[in-house]
């Protein structure tokens, strides 16, 4: 089993999308990259903690490669928007890859370089690639948020 952690705006739709991929064993919504221990949603929404809304993914690398997760990640959001996705704005909604190994760092950066060379997006990619920090699981009401409400997607 391996881990991947991505921030791509509001975590509700991101979580639901990654859950659908074969080889993904579990997805948890949470917060990462900030300076406050055990932050709450209310804390993170102040835009003062430095945390991003993220999903932490447990996946089987024999069934799905990290590159496939990256392809899904870049297809889920606009990685050229700085600190926002759609109507949501603030640093908590930044585009970020928290890598769990030097290999993930190398693969993620090479993936971004390839997307840039291919001109896949009309503006520069602003996705951060940073070492994984402490993942703080979000409150239970955020877990499987869309599923619990009978929704298939949100605005991402």
Curated annotation (Swiss-Prot):
EC number(s) per entry: 1.8.4.11
Xref: InterPro entries: Met_Sox_Rdtase_MsrA_dom (IPR002569), Met_Sox_Rdtase_MsrA_sf (IPR036509)
Gene Ontology biological-process entries: protein modification process
Catalytic function, reaction form: L-methionyl-[protein] + [thioredoxin]-disulfide + H2O = L-methionyl-(S)-S-oxide-[protein] + [thioredoxin]-dithiol; [thioredoxin]-disulfide + L-methionine + H2O = L-methionine (S)-S-oxide + [thioredoxin]-dithiol
Residues at the active site: 10
Any matching Pfam family: PMSR
UniProtKB keywords: Oxidoreductase
Family (UniProt): Belongs to the MsrA Met sulfoxide reductase family.
Name of the protein: Peptide methionine sulfoxide reductase MsrA
Organism: Acidobacterium capsulatum (strain ATCC 51196 / DSM 11244 / BCRC 80197 / JCM 7670 / NBRC 15755 / NCIMB 13165 / 161)
């Amino acid at each position: 089993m391996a881990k991947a952690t991505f921030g791509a705006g509001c975590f509700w739709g991101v979580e639901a999308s990654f859950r659908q991929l074969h080889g993904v064993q579990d997805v948890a919504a949470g917060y990462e990259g900030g300076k406050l221990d055990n932050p709450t949603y209310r804390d993170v929404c102040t835009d003062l903690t430095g945390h991003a809304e993220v999903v932490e993914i447990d996946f089987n690398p024999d069934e799905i490669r990290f590159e496939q997760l990256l392809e899904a990640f870049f297809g889920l959001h606009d990685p050229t928007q700085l600190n926002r996705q759609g109507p949501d704005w603030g640093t908590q909604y930044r585009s970020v890859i928290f890598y769990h190994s030097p290999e993930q760092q190398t693969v993620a950066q090479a993936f971004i370089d390839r997307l840039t060379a291919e001109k896949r997006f009309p503006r520069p990619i602003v996705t951060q690639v940073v070492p994984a920090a402490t993942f703080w699981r979000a409150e239970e009401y955020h877990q499987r948020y869309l599923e619990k409400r009978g929704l298939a997607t949100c605005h991402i």
